[in-house]
Amino acid sequence: MHRSYRRVVTGHDKNGAAIIESDQVATQTLERPNRPGVRLTNFWITDQTPAEYDGPTETCLGPLTLKPPARGSVFRCVEFMPEDPEVMAQLSSEDGAAAFAEMGAGDNVVRGGRHPWMHRTDSVDYGVVLNGEIWMLMDNEQDDVLLKAGDVVVQRGSNHAWANRGTEPCTIMFVLTDGVTSSGEGKGIPLRNGN
């Protein structure tokens, strides 16, 4: 069962005193039938760096997209229910592409990847596992890692997928920041889908 999140946003009154501008349940959520058991909730989005702290009170408007805006960031929570192995066995990267297309990121899926939702974003993502446990799958199985409550991950534009193979839900808080590759560093980061 997915939960609701109270979101408190601070600001300033006309005299510059600190106030609470908004105190309500976060409403920008996304659940998709072609990505069963996963729910995303956005809390805040910025569209520039440095970010404005005296701008609008509500930034989570329009459709929920996977990646942050250019030069921006997204603060979000993702809840992963345990995966059903029978359902997973029937899915392919084409199913993953369809699910990610609903978030404006169909091209982010790794075609023929190890997991239907293996993907990559051009971003640096900071994640904190709040509860449960989850496998972070990489291109090669020997690099997979089991993350547990209290673990943090810094995802730097690499192919990955999330797989909850346990029996309890897993919740991860993320801050996604727009990113670029450093040219000439010799990291050998492959172009996405051969492009």
Regions flagged by a language model, labelled:
Residues 8, 12, 18-20, 29, ...:
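Double-stranded beta-helix
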Residues 113-121, 126-148, 187:
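A short beta-strand-loop-beta hairpin characteristic of the jelly-roll/cupin
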Residues 47-66, 74-79, 87-90, 98:
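Terminal, intrinsically disordered low-complexity segments enriched in charged/polar
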Residues 25-27, 75-121, 156-159:
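Conserved short histidine dyad/triad with adjacent acidic residue
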Residues 1-60:
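N-terminal leader/capping segments at the start of a protein or of a new domain
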Residues 21, 136-137, 154-155:
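A generic structural signal for residues embedded in beta-strands
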Residues 48-60, 65-69, 178-194:
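Non-heme Fe(II)/2-oxoglutarate
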